[in-house]
């Protein structure tokens, strides 16, 4: 398992995680 692959997968994971948190933040009325 190369370091590049790990970094790429981790970046995708962080993007999905932050996107979900952003949606929750919008739902909560940007409090």
From Swiss-Prot:
Q: What Gene Ontology cellular-component terms does the record carry?
A: extracellular region
Question: What is known about its induction?
Answer: Produced in the A cells of the islets of Langerhans in response to a drop in blood sugar concentration.
Keyword terms, alphabetized: Hormone, Secreted
* Keyword field contains Secreted: yes
Subcellular compartments: Secreted
What's the main place this protein lives?
A: secreted
- Lineage: superkingdom: Eukaryota
| Molecular functions (GO terms) | hormone activity
Main role? Answer: Glucagon plays a key role in glucose metabolism and homeostasis. Regulates blood glucose by increasing gluconeogenesis and decreasing glycolysis.
Q: Which family does it belong to?
A: Belongs to the glucagon family.
Q: Protein name, please?
A: Glucagon-4
Organism whose genome encodes this protein: Huso dauricus
């Amino acid at each position: 398992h190369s370091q590049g692959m790990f970094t790429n997968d981790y970046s995708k994971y962080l993007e999905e995680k932050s996107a979900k948190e952003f949606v929750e933040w919008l739902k909560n009325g940007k409090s």
